[in-house]
Amino acid sequence: VLQPLPDGSANTTGAAGDENRCMHQRRIGTPSEIGQACYSQGMSEEKCPTAVSQLDAMKRGERSSTDLVNASLQRIGECNPTLNAVITLAEERALTEAEAWDRAYLDERSLPPLAGLPVLIKDNQRTEGIRTTLGSARHLDTIPQHDAGIVRRLRAAGAVVVGKTNIPEYSI
């Protein structure tokens, strides 16, 4: 189903609903627009924290996985209208997984190395339950039943998949 975005471009929503939103068919900004949207704000540690600093902050109890997922979603919301870098979001699932990791950190269990870290996956990698289009409108309704090997390993290491990033059609 095509739905208009606030800027008048098209947005597609598949069977999984809004929690698995797809943002195909949007204009990509010029380098100047991209720079104004994100880089002019400065790429500070606060705006663009490293994976290591995020994991350390969670281990010290200064940040939660839920905080990091929400911050990631906010940053995507700020920059993506210009960048069109993220084409599918899995907000509800990511927040549910983040809450589970937050509980695990509180229990002080032995945790996997990426426990609670928000990540984005290229759209040419199958992600169970999250739309995988291969960058093609032909696959807008494809929701895999299994993860690709790399996604399976990331999840096993504790990563929280927030969404999928744009690629050229079929990665060509």
Predicted regions and their residues:
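Hydrophobic, low-acid, alpha-helix-prone terminal segments
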Residues: 1-9, 27, 31-34
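Hydrophobic face of alpha-helices
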Residues: 2, 6, 66-70, 95, ...
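Intrinsic low-complexity, disordered N-terminal segments enriched in polar/charged/small residues
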Residues: 1, 15-18
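An N-terminal boundary/leader segment
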Residues: 33-93
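Long amphipathic alpha-helix in the N-terminal Rossmann-like dinucleotide-binding domain
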Residues: 92-99, 158-159, 168
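Short glycine/serine-rich loop/turn segments
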Residues: 113-172
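Intrinsically disordered, low-complexity segments enriched in small polar residues
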Residues: 21, 26-27
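Immediate post-signal peptide segment of exported/extracytoplasmic ligand-binding proteins
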Residues: 101-117
